[in-house]
Amino acid sequence: MALLVVILQAITLLATVIGSRSGGCDGGMKKVILSLALGTFGLGMAEFGTMGVLTELAHNVGISIPAAGHMISYYALGVVVGAPIIALFSSRYSLKHILLFLVALCVIGNAMFTLSSSYLMLAIGRLVSGFPHGAFFGVGAIVLSKIIKPGKVTAAVAGMVSGMTVANLLGIPLGTYLSQEFSWRYTFLLIAVFNIAVMASVYFWVPDIRDEAKGNLREQFHFLRSPAPWLIFAATMFGNAGVFAWFSYVKPYMMFISGFSETAMTFIMMLVGLGMVLGNMLSGRISGRYSPLRIAAVTDFIIVLALLMLFFCGGMKTTSLIFAFICCAGLFALSAPLQILLLQNAKGGELLGAAGGQIAFNLGSAVGAYCGGMMLTLGLAYNYVALPAALLSFAAMSSLLLYGRYKRQQAADTPVLAKPLG
């Protein structure tokens, strides 16, 4: 219970500190950012919580550990399927009502998963839990773009994302502890109950506003005619794939390449979790001075260098810890600026664009894990997973550079007379 209080205090502090960089935030706006941060914390717990309870889940339900691992994939499938469906068929409702519906799905999905006693029911529970994930980030970003003054939205979105980073740092260890001491069901029961509290915060703190930019179903797809959103989708997918090609194998890498003991992995995972928190915080802090494009492109470049160092210097314990920290910090430093770039390039279909970003993110996780696994299938050492990881992150950076070139060319082709006079 004490750890749960610490977690809630951490979310409140981070959301307030990062969100306050959005400038001109009154108490009401800070409560909106906090409410959305609580929502992303619940999503982070649900998405990654199964990783710490696989053994207990398999033994309790009577399935194999690989079959229990399928629950991670079912959640990702729910994200991929649910995000566009919700985005396309929610235009008649206010953004607040959409958020309430999404959090209600989180409650239902995690409650189903908690009470399941068969593989089929577990899978359905995970699918339902994943359905609202992408749309929540999209709707949350749109809400913030409407109540925060232009140029400060990136910091506000980073405040929203801070909940996800706290889930990685503190929430998942709490879930693992509950599973080991009591039952894995306690972990997901806690997530379901927590999301009821999130619903209350959305109801009382989020204003009832509409996305007036929505048109008919066909008009929501018009933004996809431009190469700009596709380049951002590519940057999102390749950027996440790059980090996950290495991070998916972080435990054997640290044990067999860097020489850490298995007992040290708890400290290492908390260290990289701290990197995620600080990376997201730094991204929000500098958003007032640099454009989202510059932040994202430079971050991808730093990740490429860090991954190359993990390949060449993995045998040095201190070095491997430093660059593991940098990689995971970079992963969440990318989140807010890429979300803003998608909103800027999805006029008329903002929710669909933001949902597409979450699809790209989850596809990146799958692509990255597969590419890293290929190195192991070839019989290479664990440090070789950092090579395809660096290549994928370089592809992400290249996509952003191509996007920047396209936008500059587009601006150059715009007639000067088209600019407003005065």
Located regions from the model:
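Conserved MFS/SLC helix-loop-helix module at the cytosolic interface between two early adjacent transmembrane helices
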Residues: 81-117
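Helix-to-loop junctions at the C-terminal end of transmembrane segments
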Residues: 83-94, 279-291, 376-377
